[in-house]
Every structure is written in structure tokens, then in C-alpha cells.
């Protein structure tokens, strides 16, 4: 999920916007920092039954976005082992991209789930914390992204679920709320309607790739509606370098694991 928002955030320094068009408040000093809370049975401050109901619907929406293909999407990029598509939505926008990797779906997902390594391939992350795990397949993670120019930093508070869709590995994320984890002063909380990763086996190609990865997100980044179209298209152009970073760190991780 992080990579989609990271690319959206990276477009802020390219978008010009007057102060009159933006309603972001100036950052204020705030000593409060989100503290890590881990409880295997429940996570303090969150309503698990409500989250479970919400994620059930989100998984269905995720599956629909995966299965609908790219009809109606704008093609943002299509070369060098990476295809990027985007479309406007009634709320926010949808970004979808695919690329292939020379590792199995299980190996790829294992690497992407290692929170401690995310900053090695996503330089836009300022801070990331696991708030807690309900079990090995369900977690809540807080992520804060770096500020760009006059734009306030973005942050997400997301519930993540590892599951199977169409018989393939997937990780689906949605935004959650908690009074214990309010939006920090000087930051804008991004709303994730649904986001995630989907990894499926493919016939090995000439480069040794054997998994097709699809990453998608439907989000509201807290931008004025007039800027969504510009943001989604520019964000799409920043994705290919990110996928290359992921592949580089993925290879490094498994090479070092053999030592």
C-alpha cells in the first residue's frame, strides 16, 4: 500500500498551487508521537468487529478492480517491464500498475511485508510503525510521509490483511480511525478506500520473471478535486523508478539471506 501513496506524495513538488486554493493549516509544534501498541488479542483503540465488516467489503472491491482489467483507464506508462494505469473516481482516483519479478509470489509478499525494510525502497517514508497485530495476517500500521515544499506531510493509518483472491496471494489495506491515533498537527490524513498488492504465477520469461505483481489503490489524498487529475497522472510517471528500487532491494534481501 505504501508505494502507491509514496508516488502520489512525490508529485507534490511538481504541482503548483496558490495558498488560496489550499486549506492546509500551518504545522504546529506537537510533542505527541504515536506510540506502538501491540496486543495479539486486540489492539487498543480499534473496533475489530467493525473493521472486519469493512474489510470484507473492501476485499470484494479489490477483487473487482483486479478483475475489471484496464478498460476505461488512462495509460500513463507502458514499457520497461512496467505498466501504469489510472482513472478518476467519484471520490479520489484509482491507480493501478503491474510488473514482473523473478521470485515466487510467496517470496515477493514475504519481502513486502517486512516493515523494517520499506524505507530501503521508499525514500518518501519519514516514519512507519506497526501499531499492532491481530494475528500474523492482520495488522494496523501508521505511516508518515515526508513533506514536499509548501505541502503538508501526508499520513495513513491502515488495517492490512493478507488473504487469497482468485487463488492468488494478496494484501488488502483500508483506512481505519481511532481516537488514540488522531491526525497529527501539520499533517493530512489520506483516506484509503482500498489499496493493496496481488501476486500471481506466470510462465517464466526470458528474464527469469515468474510472478506478475499488480498494485492498486483507490484513495483520497486530501487534494482539491481540481488537482486530482493532475496528481494521478504525474504520480503514475514516478512509479517505474519505484518498482526498480523494489526489485533491487528484493534481490539484495534474498542474496544476503543465502549468506
Model-based region annotation:
Residues 2-259:
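Eukaryotic helix-grip
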Amino acid at each position: 500500500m505504501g508505494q502507491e501513496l509514496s508516488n502520489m506524495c512525490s508529485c507534490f513538488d511538481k504541482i503548483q498551487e496558490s495558498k488560496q486554493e489550499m486549506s492546509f493549516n500551518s504545522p504546529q509544534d506537537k510533542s505527541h508521537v504515536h506510540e506502538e501498541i501491540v496486543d495479539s488479542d486486540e489492539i487498543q483503540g480499534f473496533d475489530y468487529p467493525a473493521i472486519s465488516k469493512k474489510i470484507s467489503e473492501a476485499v470484494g472491491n479489490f477483487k473487482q478492480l483486479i478483475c475489471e482489467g484496464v478498460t476505461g483507464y488512462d495509460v500513463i506508462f507502458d514499457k520497461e517491464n512496467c505498466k501504469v494505469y489510472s482513472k478518476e473516481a467519484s471520490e479520489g482516483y484509482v491507480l493501478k500498475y503491474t510488473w514482473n519479478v523473478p521470485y515466487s509470489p510467496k517470496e515477493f509478499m514475504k519481502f513486502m511485508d517486512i516493515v523494517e525494510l520499506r524505507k530501503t525502497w521508499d525514500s518518501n517514508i519519514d516514519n512507519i510503525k506497526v501499531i499492532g497485530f491481530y494475528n500474523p495476517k492482520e495488522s494496523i500500521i501508521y505511516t508518515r510521509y515526508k513533506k514536499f515544499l509548501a505541502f503538508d506531510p501526508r499520513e495513513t493509518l491502515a488495517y492490512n490483511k493478507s488473504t487469497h483472491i482468485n487463488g492468488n496471494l494478496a494484501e488488502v489495506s483500508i483506512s481505519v480511525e481511532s481516537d488514540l491515533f488522531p491526525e497529527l498537527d501539520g499533517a493530512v490524513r489520506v483516506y484509503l478506500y482500498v489499496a493493496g498488492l496481488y501476486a500471481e504465477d506466470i510462465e517464466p520469461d526470458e528474464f527469469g520473471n515468474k510472478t506478475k505483481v499488480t498494485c492498486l489503490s483507490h484513495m483520497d489524498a486530501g487534494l482539491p478535486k481540481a488537482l486530482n487529475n493532475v496528481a494521478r497522472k504525474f504520480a503514475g510517471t514516478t512509479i517505474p523508478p519505484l518498482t526498480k528500487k523494489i526489485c533491487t532491494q528484493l534481490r539484495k534481501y534474498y542474496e544476503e539471506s543465502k549468506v
